[in-house]
């Protein structure tokens, strides 16, 4: 069996070179029908029943199941071994249809242009999905840097990188200045000034005016002496 296979692929190349696949072209629809082998493999129910009869018959009485095959495959019909390949006729629907796109076959008659879709580079070119996108967190600085952005055209990526770096620096400086001013506020805080402002903000009532007058009229406390002098408290003038 292996000798016949070797003879099929090596010895009988000249005989099989004359037979080539048939191509049926239809220029109108640009479809190409390729019929290399008109048959397909398969076993019918009747052939399964006849397998025992075929094995008992003589080798020369095999049916010509390879009649539809090329000459390169006819050597497999040698009856020294049992028949292991059987082919049936294939319907037309099981043939191969090879149709190239119209842009390759219609020449200049077609209006279809083969080009890359702009949606392919969406993740790279879209600014909203860029990693280096800077959100405007400094509205005051954006107005100040608007004039400088108009002078530099964002045509080259190097200029865009410089502009983004400048915006980062301006935002960092503004945040640092705000932080320092916030830290300096407690140093300038004075309790007396806060009390004065708080008292001025309060509404003037009868009791508040009376208390203010008492704080002004009362005498300061005398300094306690360390000697033997005993200081007696003065009588209370007001009961409250």
Curated annotation (Swiss-Prot):
The LC3 interacting region (LIR) motif mediates interaction with GABARAP, GABARAPL1, GABARAPL2, MAP1LC3A, MAP1LC3B and MAP1LC3C. The keyword Membrane does not apply. GO terms for molecular function: antioxidant activity. Induction: By adriamycin, gamma irradiation and H(2)O(2), in a p53/TP53-dependent way. At lower levels by UV irradiation. By TP73. One of its GO terms (cellular component) is PML body. Keywords: Activator, Antioxidant, Apoptosis, Autophagy, Cytoplasm, Cytoplasmic vesicle, Nucleus, Transcription, Transcription regulation, Tumor suppressor. Ubiquitously expressed. It comes from the Eukaryota. The keyword Heme does not apply. A motif (LIR) lies at residues 25-37. Its main location: cytoplasm. Interacts with p53/TP53 and HIPK2. Interacts with PRKCG, GABARAP, GABARAPL1, GABARAPL2, MAP1LC3A, MAP1LC3B and MAP1LC3C. This is Tumor protein p53-inducible nuclear protein 1. Antiproliferative and proapoptotic protein involved in cell stress response which acts as a dual regulator of transcription and autophagy. Acts as a positive regulator of autophagy. In response to cellular stress or activation of autophagy, relocates to autophagosomes where it interacts with autophagosome-associated proteins GABARAP, GABARAPL1/L2, MAP1LC3A/B/C and regulates autophagy. Acts as an antioxidant and plays a major role in p53/TP53-driven oxidative stress response. InterPro entries: TP53INP. It is found in: Cytoplasm, Cytosol; Nucleus; Nucleus, PML body; Cytoplasmic vesicle, Autophagosome. GO terms for biological process: apoptotic process; autophagic cell death; autophagosome assembly; cellular response to ethanol; cellular response to hydroperoxide; cellular response to methyl methanesulfonate; cellular response to UV; negative regulation of cell migration.
């Amino acid at each position: 069996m292996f000798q016949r296979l070797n003879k099929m692929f090596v010895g009988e190349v000249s005989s099989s070179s004359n037979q080539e696949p048939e191509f049926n072209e239809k220029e109108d629809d640009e479809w190409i029908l390729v019929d290399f082998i008109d048959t397909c493999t398969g076993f019918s129910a009747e052939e399964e029943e006849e397998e025992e009869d075929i094995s008992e018959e003589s080798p020369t009485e095999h049916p010509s199941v390879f009649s539809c095959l090329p000459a390169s495959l006819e050597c497999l019909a040698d009856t020294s071994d049992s028949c292991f390949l059987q082919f049936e006729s294939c319907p037309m629907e099981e043939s191969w249809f090879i149709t190239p796109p119209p842009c390759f076959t219609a020449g200049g008659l077609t209006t279809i242009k083969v080009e890359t879709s702009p949606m392919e580079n969406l993740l790279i070119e879209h600014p909203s999905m860029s990693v280096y996108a800077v959100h405007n967190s400094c509205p005051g600085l954006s107005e100040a840097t608007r004039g400088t952005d108009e002078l530099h055209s964002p045509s080259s990526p190097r200029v865009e990188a410089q502009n983004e770096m400048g915006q980062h620096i301006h935002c960092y400086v503004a945040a640092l200045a705000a932080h320092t001013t916030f830290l300096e506020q407690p140093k300038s805080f004075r309790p007396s000034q806060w009390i004065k402002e708080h008292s001025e903000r309060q509404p003037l009532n009868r009791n508040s005016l009376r208390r203010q007058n008492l704080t002004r009229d009362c005498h300061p406390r005398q300094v306690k002496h360390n000697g033997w002098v005993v200081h007696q408290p003065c009588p209370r003038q007001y009961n409250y």
